[in-house]
Structure formats: structure tokens, C-alpha cells
Amino acid sequence: MLQRDAVIDVDESEIPPIPFVLAFNDLTYNVTLQQRFGLRFGHSPAKIKTLLNGITGEAKEGEILAILGASGAGKSTLIDALAGQIAEGSLKGTVTLNGEALQSRLLRVISAYVMQEDLLFPMLTVEETLMFAAEFRLPRSLSKSKKRNRVETLIDQLGLTTVKNTVIGDEGHRGVSGGERRRVSIGTDIIHDPIVLFLDEPTSGLDSTSAFMVVQVLKKIARSGSIVIMSIHQPSGRIMEFLDRVIVLSSGQIVFSDSPATLPLFFSEFGSPIPEKENIAEFTLDLIKDLEGSPEGTRGLVEFNRNWQHRKLRVSQEPHHNSSSLGEAINASISRGKLVSTSYRSIPSYVNPWWVETVILAKRYMINWTRTPELIGTRVFIVMMTGFLLATVYWKVDDSPRGVQERLSFFSFAMATMFYSCADGLPAFIQERYIFLRETAHNAYRRSSYVISHSLVTLPHLFALSIGFAATTFWFVGLNGGLAGFIYYLMIIFASFWSGCSFVTFVSGVIPNVMMSYMVTFGYLSYCLLFSGFYVNRDRIHLYWIWIHYISLLKYPYEAVLHNEFDDPSRCFVRGNQVFDNTIMEGVSETTKAKLLETMSGYLGMELTESTCLTTGSDLLKQHGIEQLDKWGCLWVTLAWGFFFRILFYFSLLLGSKNKRA
């Protein structure tokens, strides 16, 4: 354990152990059911559902309090209520620690909430995962060596020493087992050695052996000086032996609250004795299910439990003589080596400044990404293959009218490719979303730091994509501008990737469903392509649709590459004899064309020959209505779209990551 002087200054005199007691009294939580279809007419009242109804109990330091019940009984809701995950005003009743109401900022420091899902980066090792958790949660005043010592101690406590250098793994990469993964998930949340630990069904989805090992670890954590409160669906007999107290719920009400060892006596007095060699938890849940299906429901069992509790209180007559004020208990806990990060009277919102958070997040991203080179390499390969395909289709286009149309077609398809290829990043944040929610719930880092690091880490990847596409198309298609033109072409491709990926990132932050986010992304990009100016010129778009033209992400990069290609006024694209191309006169002899040009010269009052330039690049830009911004203005607007969507992404995280229930 770390020394206390690295965390908080306390009296050097011997401080006796003062146990923590988390008490909750008469917790009631109601929700208004939303009507999914139709409207509510007249003054019919909204339907109210009670999720918690008068829940009272306590949990003590060194003990495991388990909340049992069938699905929908209110287990997770009660965990959320105790963990401060329900908005103030919605929850009735009180939750106190050593007799003092818990403020949300203090609760973040002294507690941890382990979600049911194992939310971890797959390509980090066990040790790296816990070390990053230490960087986020432990005080910056602690040295790197002390943080590493804490990680080593925790790895040993969790029984993960043999796999500490093994990656977490996922569907495509072999890693730790399910039980080990669950213990790592617990470890990331208890890195700061919390006083109170909440867990939502930590044994869910595990085999009996793995589940037993998880509960063994939780027992060690409780004995180290923590209160452990967890929900569990149907524990085995071995697991029941590790539980100190059990609360059994049915429809949001307590039907039993005591030591699991008293369950046989409880049900025997209720009139439903537990058969010998029967799994106690299984019998309890089956009996409750039968009662819930009866006309009276579980009212009789709820009332019997109340009488049971009253008799127990009269017999025990045990006051809370060990309970102490919260401040004294925290100081005593710190003196014994608990890693509460600071004084309970002065709690910082974050342990690190924003720039340190940004560096840590960027480092974690880079490690995770560099261990999946096949993903990055595949995307670069696909973009380069697309560029190679376009280069072979539009190989060395000339300066004829037909060549102009081919250039326009190439630019439209190329710019669309930039944006559509960004859609493969949609699942990335959606997969990380719950990791982000878990970490920011305890103020591990700022949302702004996450957005900045996320943006910075993507830049090298986007630059590699840009180089790959530009190098395989510019010279082989025969685009204009030489080296300067290539550099600008590379810049606008990079800006397009930046803008497209920023848009996709924003969508993934707003819509947490992969299929829906794909639909929104491709739908919006299709409209952007339609109104970009290639299919319909700006002056042909009706006034009621012109706004789509100006918010089209493809408009500005498309106009930028046209500027880069056609801005040279000395370059000619339609000469005298080419005026007949793509018309019924295209097949006539050159002599006839010369006579026609001579006749047209007389009517127009100007000399027209085969070499007379009729349309320059500047004329083409005017014909397509590209006059409002120059090529640099188009580049800046494209880049600005990227920053705009990153800002929107930040606000989507700010508004969408409120973890409390209404």
C-alpha cells in the first residue's frame, strides 16, 4: 500500500480503526411510463411505475452485501440509487455514510461503480490497462513508481499475476479468459482503493468457477477495508457462503434482508421450509416467482419480512457504537493505507490538468491502434487501390471537351470517395462509448481532453490515407499544376478526410446504434453529393433547396480541386475545331469544319480558326458557377467543417454522457 503522506496529511498518532457504515432508509423511486404509440387524450393520468418501494438497510465495511432478485426486481435500480446514479429529486429517501449525507463529488472519490459489461481496450495488456487507470484516477502528486507499486499490488490482489502481460483480447485476438477479463474490469475501477464498491452483476456471463473466483476477490477487497455492494442473479451455494448480508427484492420491495445463513430459518417460519441439499438462492427465487404469480403476490412475504426485522431489532438491541463521523473515518482509513486521493473537505474535479489527460489518452490510443496494423494497413490499401482504379480509368485525360467532362467526373467521384471511406470509422467510438461513459462518470478526464486526443491521434492516419490517394491519382490522371498543384491537391484531400472523419465521429457520438448511424451518414453524404455542384449547377438549384448546397460537405473540396485544375487562364480546353465535338457535326470532314468556322467568323465579327481558344479554365469555372470562393477559401472552409463537427462532437459527449437516471 502507498504511504499516507503521498495522499493526505493526518495526525501521526495512532488512529484506531473506525468502520464505515452505509445506511439507506425508505428509498423510493418512481418513473413515468412513456406512451410509445398514439396520443393521450383528455385528462387521463400518466402511468407511474414504482421501481423501488421503501427500501431500508445498511452495508458495513469488511462485508459483502448482495442484492438478489429475478430480472426486473429492481436490483440494478437499487445499485444505481446507492451509487448516486439517480438524479436528485427523483429519488426519495436518504443514503448516508457514517450518518452523513453523501455529496456527489465526494462519492466519486471514495467509491467505484463496476458496470455489468467488461469495457476494456482489447489490445492493451492487463498491466497497461491498470496502469492507465492509475494515471487517470490517482493523484498527480504520486510518483510513477508509487503508481506502479499500486498496480502491482492490485494485480496480485486480483489474482492476475500470471496474465499481467497478456492482452485483453477480443473476437479476433486471443487474450485473457472471461473471468480474468471481469477481474481486470473490476481492477480499473478500484485502482484508487475505494471505500465503497458497487458492482452490477459481476458474475453475469461467467462459468461457476470464474464466478466463484470473482467473488473470492471481492471478499478480499471487502476485508481490506471496503464496503462491497453487488447485485447478483442466482448465486451458487459456494458463492452464498462468501456473502455477509443479502437483500432479496421482488417488484422493488424487500422480501428478505439478513445474513444468508438465516434464510432456512426465515422460510421455515414463513411456512415454506427449504428442502435439504436444495440450492438456497434457487429455492428463494423460485418461491418468489410462484408468489408473484398468485393473486396476493408477495405482499405476505413482504409483511413477514418486516415483522422478522422488528423481532430481530428487539432481540439484538445493538446500537451502532462503532460508527463515527465521516471525516474521522476517512482520516483513519487513509492512515491505514487506503488510497483516497485527497482530503474529503477539498475535492478536485480532476486529478490531472487537461494537457496531461490529453497526452495519456493519446498514448493509450496509439498503443491500442499500433497493435492492430492490419486494420490501418487495410484501410490505406483500399484507398490506394481505389486511387489506382481511378487512375487506370481516367488515364492521362487530355484537354479536349471530352477530357473536361472526364476531369469533372473524376473529381466528383474522388471527393465522394474521401467522405464515404470515412464511414468505416463509425463503429470505433460506438465501441468505446461505454468505456468513455464509465471513465467520465468518475471524472477520470475531461470530455474536451478526450476530443482533443481523439482528433490528434487520427491526424497521422489521415495523412497516410491522403498521401496514398494523391500519389496514385495526380500524376497518372494527368492533373494540372505541377508540384505546387500536387501539394494543394494533397492538402484538399487531407482536409476532406479530416472533415469527413469529424462528421462521422460526431454522428457516432449522437447515435449509439451502428446501423442507424450508417443510415444517417450515407443519407446525408448522398444529399451532399447531389447538391455539390457536379450533378446540378448552383444557378439551377431552386431557392428552397439552395441551403443544402451551402451545407454540402462535398461542395467545397469539389470546387477546390476545380480551382486547382482550371484556374490557369492560359490553358485552353475548347479550340475552334473542338466546338463541334459531342454534336451531330463531329463526324464531318475537317474541310467542312473549317468552312463552318469561317462562316461563324462572319456572323460573330471575329476570326475563328482551328487553333482559336474558345473556352479557358476560367470560363469553365464561370460556367459551373464556381465564383464565390477561391481555392484557398474552399480549403479553409473544408478544414473549418472538420473543426465544427469536432465541437459538435464535444457537446454531444457533454449532453449524452450524463450517467444519472432522471
UniProtKB/Swiss-Prot annotation:
Chief location category: membrane
Question: What membrane topology is annotated for this entry?
Answer: Multi-pass membrane protein
Q: Which domain of life is it from?
A: Eukaryota
The UniProt record lists the ABC transporter domain at 22-276
Q: Which UniProt keywords apply?
A: ATP-binding, Membrane, Nucleotide-binding, Transmembrane, Transmembrane helix, Transport
What's a Pfam family in this record?
A: ABC_tran
Compartments it resides in: Membrane
Gene Ontology CC terms: membrane
Q: A single GO molecular function, which one?
A: ATP hydrolysis activity
List, for all copies, the residue spans of the domain called ABC transmembrane type-2: 356-566
> Which residues span the membrane?
375-395, 410-430, 451-471, 486-508, 514-536, 635-655
Q: Tell me the Gene3D superfamilies matching this sequence.
A: P-loop containing nucleotide triphosphate hydrolases
Q: Does Transmembrane helix appear among the keywords?
A: yes
Please tell me where ATP binds in this chain: 69-76
Family that this chain belongs to: Belongs to the ABC transporter superfamily. ABCG family. Eye pigment precursor importer (TC 3.A.1.204) subfamily.
Write the protein's name: ABC transporter G family member 17
Source species of the chain:
Arabidopsis thaliana (Mouse-ear cress)
